[in-house]
Amino acid sequence: MLKIIIPTAMLMPMTCLSKPNMIWINSTTYSLLISLISLSYLNQLGGHSLNFSLLFFSDSLSAPLLVLTTWLLPLMLMASQSHLSKETPSRKKLYITMLTLLQLLLIMTFTATELIMFYILFEATLIPTLIIITRWGDQTERLNAGLYFLFYTLVGSLPLLVALLYIQNTTGTLNFLIIQYWAKPISTTWSNIFLWLACMMAFMVKMPLYGLHLWLPKAHVEAPIAGSMVLAAVLLKLGGYGMMRITVLLNPATNQMAYPFMMLSLWGMVMTSSICLRQTDLKSLIAYSSVSHMALVIVAVLIQTPWSYMGATALMIAHGLTSSMLFCLANSNYERVHSRTMILARGLQTILPLMAAWWLLASLANLALPPTINLIGELFVVMASFSWSNMTIILMGTNIIITALYSLYMLIMTQRGKYTHHIKNINPSFTRENALMALHLLPLLLLSLNPKIVLGPIY
């Protein structure tokens, strides 16, 4: 485990000691090397977990998320270069240090064995994210967005700490590896219902569940590009990962308690997709589409069948790469047009044909076209929910149609139509941006050749 944690920690002093003209080159190449080392975790034998020590372990659920986390740091650094070109070197170094610190905390969160340690790290990821949003965001509303983000997540996860201390007292351990054998079945008495809610609410807010999702569009819209990328790609996955880990302790209460939340998710999935059709702000549209995709993951985790778990894991990885790519594309538009409003940036296909190709591929990945891993995840979730209840197919089908509609709407609004006069003399697409898009899309396509490495612990 230390072969990733120590190099990531040493990224911080390396950034601080780099010469001003070498900051980006050093940090990007070094973080790419770290992400290549982390690939060794994917090749695990059967369903066994790699127990690195008493503190860290990795199994087939956390390994794909771990690799996604490390893979995202070089991409975030590549995406942030022109956004930070006006800043002083010390500010750039601080920014990279924040991203590295965030990656370090996320790696430790995904591999922690103790639930209390998981909780502390889960909360600690708020701090660098908050600093990134409130310091480098574009508009003045970023402070408001940061407050929303902080308080939603904190208030949601405080009861979790109380619940964890209670479980520690009753079972005597909070170690993931031991507690699955020691956990006593939880019946549906009133006290256990509150215990269930306390355990799940933190992750429901983080996912986010429809109704608790108001912080997400705000935080996404106001964050700088790297903030949006890491928020969409990894921080939302913390919720899904935590839910999968903690449902082991909460059976059989989950079977009764899951119904209202599944209804809310299925309804919210259709609602947020419909909200996407009415958006004028590009980043806001992508943020709402994230909510609708993560609602599928909530449904899958609460169904608790092997298929739904596999679908949830695959969908989390796929959504991480897809939404991150869409945010990068939105950012490349923003850097040229200096507005997130879609009407002001229409007709870009005639000026930037290669970017239009990336837009098309990203939109197709977002609506789960066959060769991508998105399809595998969505197919598993839809089939699992259909076998749970036949009625869900109505909502799932509606959601899939609306997803196709808003993806088409996004593509037509930004790429087609008559271009406006103020974008005649914009910059061409850089090699850096094309490489960034390719590095997002390649894993999505290559994983479909061998999807079992992202299908989680049950496969």
UniProtKB/Swiss-Prot annotation:
Task: State the EC number(s).
Answer: 7.1.1.2
Q: Which organism is it from?
A: Felis catus
Signal peptide location in the record?
Answer: none
Places the protein is found:
Mitochondrion inner membrane
Q: What is this protein called?
A: NADH-ubiquinone oxidoreductase chain 4
What disulfide bonds does the UniProt entry report for this chain?
none
Cellular component, GO annotation: mitochondrial inner membrane; respiratory chain complex I
Q: Which UniProt keywords apply?
A: Electron transport, Membrane, Mitochondrion, Mitochondrion inner membrane, NAD, Respiratory chain, Translocase, Transmembrane, Transmembrane helix, Transport, Ubiquinone
Reactions catalysed, as given in the entry: a ubiquinone + NADH + 5 H(+)(in) = a ubiquinol + NAD(+) + 4 H(+)(out)
Keyword Transport among record annotations: yes
User: How does the protein's chain sit in the membrane according to the entry?
Assistant: Multi-pass membrane protein
